[in-house]
Amino acid sequence: MDALIKPLRAGKPDAKPADPKGTEFRPAELDPAEFLAAAVKPDQPRPSRGEAEQAVKTLLAYIGEDTAREGLLDTPRRVVEAYDELFQGYHQCPAEVLNRTFGETAGYDDFVLIRDMSFTSHCEHHVMPFYGKAHIAYTPVERVVGLSKLARLVDIFAHRLQTQEHLTAQIAAAVDEVLKPRGVAVMIEAEHTCMSVRGIAKQGAVTFTSRFTGMFRDNPAEQARFMSMIRGGR
């Protein structure tokens, strides 16, 4: 099931219809600036670390905690340090990860698939973790990218506040834009703690999203082969 990505900004028109020649790969509603560059600019105004720690202290007081007790004295600092790690993707550039490619393909003309890349991200609605596996396939034209680069790409986008649909679309769009392959297939399966530990509390529920471009979008047989290779051997 191809994830239906709605316009991500208010007032933006719906995505353009697919080009019949299969040349319009990138979802029209995604601005390249949001998936090719670091999300935070070096000169972008930001709260100070002290202000961030004070915000954590305020939240602790809001839930009724005594922020002066021994066990919580260093909690604001620890939380801010954890945020630096969990959301480091805002300071990383996805395009740079994919820019180094190799031309020694010996005429290889089938798709390349990396499956079961584990990741943890945080939903933008409740800032709670969701985690699972990402599967990426692409069919190179002349050059291929190092296998670890696709895993790093997943990590960059996962280390930002996300929805699973947006994460899926960003990964596919970045691979399409930088590598210019014949097609890209991305599938993500994840469990969301905002659904499993709060609200309806349905533990074990898994959400699937996918995005197909180019030869994958236009050829259901290639989609089926991609899916069967993901499931093979499990």
Swiss-Prot record:
Region (Disordered): 1-26
Keywords for the protein's UniProt record, in alphabetical order: GTP-binding, Hydrolase, Metal-binding, Nucleotide-binding, One-carbon metabolism, Zinc
Ribosomal protein recorded as keyword: no
Residues annotated for Zn(2+) binding in this entry: C123, H126, C194
GO BP: any one term: tetrahydrofolate biosynthetic process
Catalytic activity: GTP + H2O = 7,8-dihydroneopterin 3'-triphosphate + formate + H(+)
Pathway the protein takes part in: Cofactor biosynthesis; 7,8-dihydroneopterin triphosphate biosynthesis; 7,8-dihydroneopterin triphosphate from GTP: step 1/1
E.C. designation(s): 3.5.4.16
Enzyme category, top tier: hydrolase
Superkingdom per UniProt: Bacteria
NCBIfam families: folE, PRK09347.1-2, PRK09347.1-3
Quaternary structure and partners: Toroid-shaped homodecamer, composed of two pentamers of five dimers.
Family: Belongs to the GTP cyclohydrolase I family.
Name of the protein in question: GTP cyclohydrolase 1
Native organism taxonomy: Bacteria, Pseudomonadati, Pseudomonadota, Alphaproteobacteria, Hyphomicrobiales
